[in-house]
Amino acid sequence: MIGPSLTAFPQPRTCEAARDAAGRCYILPVENLFHPLLQEWFERRFGRPTQAQALGWPAIALGRHTLISAPTGSGKTLAAFLICIDRLIKAALDGTLQDISQAVYVSPLKALSNDVHANLQVPLDEIRDLARNRSVEIPEIRIAVRTGDTPAHERQARARKPPHIWITTPESLYILLTSASGRRGLAGVRTLILDEIHAVAGGKRGSHLSISVERLCVLAGAPITRIGLSATQRPIEEVARFLVGTENLDPQGRPLCEIVNIGYGRAMDLAVEIPEGELGPIATNALWDETIARVAELASVHRTTLVFANTRRLVERVAHQLSRLMGEENVAPHHGSLSRQTRLRVERRLKQGELKVCVATASLELGIDIGAIDLVCQLGTPRSIGILLQRVGRSGHWLGGVTKGRLFPLTRDELIESAALLYAVRRGELDRLSIPAWPLDILSQQIVAICSAETWKTDDLYRLIRRAYPYRELPRESFDAVVHLLSTGIAGRLGYRSSFLHLDGVHDVVRGRRGARIAALTSGGAIPDNADYDVILEPDGTRVGTVFEDFAVESMTGDVFLLGNSAWRIRKIERGRVLVEDARGQAPNVPFWIGEAPARTSELSTCVSIVRQAIADRLHDRNGCIRWLCDNAGLPEPAAAAAWAYVSEGKRVLSAVPTDRRVIAERFFDESGGMQLILHAPFGSRINRAWGLALRKRFCRSFDFELQAAATEDGINLSLGPQHSFPLEDVFQFLRSHQVEETLAQAVLSSPLFSVRWRWTLTRALALLRFSGGRRIPPQIQRMRADDLLAAIFPAQAGCQDNRMSPDIDIPDHPLVFETLRDCLHEALDSDGLREVLRCLERGEIELLARDTAMPSVFSHQILNAMPYAFLDDAPLEERRARAVFMRRVLPEESSDLGKLSPDAIQSASEDAWPEVRDAEELHDALVGLVVF
């Protein structure tokens, strides 16, 4: 592996690589790599190569698969492209340049695709101008973007005359590989570049892409050089395996790939900002105003500031507030629910330095080149070490630039998490990449796409799929089950549906039926559909963006809402569309979108526990604790003092601090007479949600009562009634590691999570189509059809509970049910992590404490105020028993007096409990009501 220890850059005329994995050293002069025109242009423009370029070019020139892992601003993109451009220029000058695509660049974001297209077109134009000055005419080298935003007329033009370089997304590459015209244009591809590969490898989108890559290699019929570009990852070898596939692994499983691992060597200026007012369990309006004012103050002394928020609703709110402080012309939002034209306009203004502030979700998280950004602000926490590095890396996006980021925690728990983030960054910690194992819904979709283009022998098809790294361990019986499902379809009340393949058992071949290709083209992809309504500006019909279905349905004609930092008045709501007009100057509502909140990574959760324990160990020495937080977690003194005070107040009530080595059960009364049980367990929401669902199921069966429950990154809340009495220590014995997955599976089946994931699985497997007859199927119809398919495949789940003979639901052996449950247990939740936690409890490796308290500790305040995304049941916000807890604010030294009662109060309560008896009947009633026989 080529490592970051090579810090000396080579001179402009040579490009030297270090020793490869086998210890061999090779040196290739630059003049042997590039055409003189390209070499001259590069030296004029850049002077000399960056380390990523110097170490990557020789391997790429030799046709080796290459993974370049380096921070933003290190020249990764040009390192990947320049050899390819050089070959195209040489072929153009030799007269051998053909009208076929020779390179494909894939990025996970549309914005990144548009940015790379612009950044490639400029060098090509400059090289052609340089050639003209040398009296040399270079034929046109065509570059084209193909994404979901590409207009139909452009797609048709590219089908007739393919570009030499395709710039696309995973979904559009899949469409090109499935359509007849796209396949013809891709047959000559010899270079494949996968940018920001780490951003997709850990999800089903990456599994989908991995099969598309293998399909491209088969279509090309010749070796394709695979080039991967990645941020710093752990383990980097796993990313390399994902890049090259199983056909390019040695017998020991090592990737046959040149790994250029530069590491994260950029200078960083990261800090935490807290308001002067006290942080609490939720962000108050006063705190918000102070935070937004501070962001505006920082933005005013920087060229361009990029502000990240975790939700689209928050993006719109922050952009609106900042525009009131800084002027509407200086602020713009950017997120996926804005129209293509709006997003492109914001990106162009950013690149040209016309915006002071852009507020974005993850839509601008990856490597779009915006050189003017010199500050990144993160509102709340990103829940991930890697995402923090990715986001703050948008600043100083030039060679030698300094990464500058400011974190704005909005609650006390986010303050501790922000400290843990900076602690992790200072120590070079990274989130561990985990690649999902052979997802069957993606497999189903890709098999339909593959077989709709040509006939395959089933054995050959199985071998092709297993070449994709996520499918390296795909069991043959699972593959056969999916093929059988696609060939027979799903039996329903109206006959069989979703039968896309014809399986010839005699000749062992499979081919697509009529309609298979259309279904694969119009309903493919790994990203689940959102139930969104288009927002259309009248009278010109311009698409402004989208809003969530529930928001559209709950709105009325005349309502004013915010989208894209502009106010719109609703004129009419139609099926799937909201017709609007400009409402500039009127006070708008902020729309909402519903989705799953990002979960904190296990590596960051570990760092949260380290920081908590470090504070707990130094509570006796306030100044020493503050110094430790300043030195090791990068907190300013006011933030460090606030962290010390928070942990100190919590320990005063619980006598200990919860960490990943110490779980505390806390129980207290609420105002309704019931009790709230809090499990303080900072394992992250994926483990805690699994734990909470399983506990809720056990409580339901033990007490015959459906509990309200919630789970956050740092704990679990169970709302108990007056009848739920048990020794508090018993809560740790309710679940055992050897049976928790079965209990959790039953809990998931009765939760809203299963129905959502079921619909996603059906859509990805093409059992539930997104389009039919050229029109999009409305979300409400999709939900109805998903329910019908559930009744056909899994009648026990869809049936009436009163007719069940057993409390457990028998789970059928069906690939779609299997995949949905696996999604719930291992993607949305972390059942493996929960099992390991329970094993540690059973082995005594985690300390267990039980505390009945007179008042809730400050550690419980955030979960008691949890928002709906944390709920584990379907009770609405206004009916939550946790909201009946009175969280009074007292000084810590006064908290010990909360359980004391005055003698007068005791006498008054006694008189109320034992009524005055005046005759025999009243004595009888008193004895019946108060005495237990």
Whereabouts are the PLM-identified features?
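Short, solvent-exposed secondary-structure boundary/capping segments
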Residues: 574-591
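Helicase motor core with emphasis on the C-terminal RecA-like subdomain
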Residues: 30, 34-40, 48, 55, ...
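Loop/turn positions that initiate beta-strands
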Residues: 558-559, 563-564
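Short alpha-helix capping/helix-loop boundary micro-motifs
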Residues: 543-554
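Short beta-strand-centered aromatic/proline hotspots
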Residues: 566-573
